[in-house]
Amino acid sequence: MAASGLRQAAVAASTSVKPIFSRDMNEAKRRVRELYRAWYREVPNTVHLFQLDISVKQGRDKVREMFKKNAHITDPRVVDLLVIKGKMELEETIKVWKQRTHVMRFFHETEAPRPKDFLSKFYVGHDP
């Protein structure tokens, strides 16, 4: 009897999960596009304001890379959470709450994925 009550509660909880902002994936994608455009427009100001040693094109390429890194996500709640974090980062950058080193951390060389199988780890020199 108690198990069926727990099962019903779990089913009710899973069906009543409310979205953070977006009702569906289309609305979440719209929010992502808005954030992408805001970042894309802000790159020239950021490069000039922080006197970065990169070009505007390199900055925009990095923005594109950061957005494409999460392109596989299909849950609107997760997308909304990432959009919220992106807006916070954008606000911190615009209002110069960051220092130059904080901004330049985004421009480290892209790391190659670590090997997963034994032989690849052995050849590279990582512990198995």
From Swiss-Prot:
It is a peripheral membrane protein. GO terms for biological process: mitochondrial respiratory chain complex I assembly. Keywords: Acetylation, Electron transport, Membrane, Mitochondrion, Mitochondrion inner membrane, Respiratory chain, Transport. The modification N-acetylalanine is found at A2. GO terms for cellular component: mitochondrial inner membrane; mitochondrion; respiratory chain complex I. InterPro entries: Complex1_LYR_NDUFA6_LYRM6, NADH_Ub_cplx-1_asu_su-6. It is found in: Mitochondrion inner membrane. Mammalian complex I is composed of 45 different subunits. Belongs to the complex I LYR family. Accessory subunit of the mitochondrial membrane respiratory chain NADH dehydrogenase (Complex I), that is believed to be not involved in catalysis. Required for proper complex I assembly. Complex I functions in the transfer of electrons from NADH to the respiratory chain. The immediate electron acceptor for the enzyme is believed to be ubiquinone. This is NADH dehydrogenase [ubiquinone] 1 alpha subcomplex subunit 6. It comes from Bos taurus (Bovine).
